[in-house]
């Protein structure tokens, strides 16, 4: 039995060695790309410094409105910061359980509304093409993991769904999901158990054009490479969304106490070739 285990482990060990050698190479390639082309910052943490800067770069709610696939309805505006607010360059989203009947979500699967929460989306869209072939999207988060909490940092199509790329998504546990949806059934998922997700961690995607139709999306947590997913996202504009849904895929019943989700050091940048 020991011999069999050793034989089985050998390919794994060689694979680990190969992966370890690839990771520095990826970082070097990305640095080389940045050096070779013009690098532009699209959004940075100055947009979390005050509401004037924030509202110049971000919209309140989802791009399509207040509802999505969970039991939270999003609230927020330039005059309503009960569920989305800024302090010391940190964005906080607060989900609060409601005690009255507010009907059901207008989005599939039309769950009963049990919470008020918050969502934001970028005014500028990510588009991978010949002019902007490389993008970096990253942010630091403190996330809740209580059953029923569903924080996310993700990209989704402006004109259709999919495309979708989930850079950070927790569903009521300490497991982060990094997903790429090419169709509703063609999905790549990389799951990582994060130690103390309620502490600050950095979630990052590097998106690079690799053909006339396809991109590679490299996913990272705290600077550690986790996976690369390939998808036909070239030329498809994407929103960047930060939100906290509740219940749904994250389980029920959700919390009765207020639930908090913090973000800082948001960064979106790209290379320009012309």
Regions found by a protein language model. Name each.
Residues 17-19:
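Bacterial signal peptide processing site
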Residues 24-274:
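GH16 jelly-roll
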